[in-house]
Amino acid sequence: NNPFEPEIERYYQLKFKAEIDGIPYRCMFDALRVDYKNKTIQPIDVKTSYKPTYNFYKSFIEWNYAYQCRLYARILKLNIEKDEYFKDFKILPYKDIVISKSNMIPLVWDCDFTFAEGILYLGKNNQIKLEAPWEVGKELWYYLSTGATVHMGINIESSNDLRTWINKME
């Protein structure tokens, strides 16, 4: 923390829990920058990479980091809404600070879709599909809680209709 900015505190490795659509989640932020004067909370994640930091946007898609920033921000929001002191604070879009051994130049990347709901389509031709993390969580919870070994909705005891499944394709 900076003595020249007494209204700003940085907190590290804070853990939170929340339930979304009946499914329990938990998270741990690398850092939260809390500005008490302006009533803002800045979630920050530190990423290390063997790739150049200027290529982080590719790793962001490859490793599905959108799930983390969207889910963690939602968990944080659900927690501060219940807190009498923090309920009026605004959560700022996620920041990823990326460092690489290859060039040792840390870069900061902003995630402007931190609070987006539903499915996101990104890329020049909207070819990158990012599911809502809580929707992916529902499917994961289904597998974990039922021991299922096939996709939700697939019938292993009788036939499945090809047209129905093909029509779900995007």
Task: Label the model's feature ranges.
Residues N1-T53:
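Catalytic cores of nuclease domains that cleave nucleic-acid phosphodiester backbones
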Residues S49-W63:
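Short helix/strand-bridging catalytic loops that position acidic/His residues to coordinate divalent metals
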Residues S59-A66, L71-E170:
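Metal-dependent nuclease catalytic regions and adjoining charged, substrate-binding loops involved
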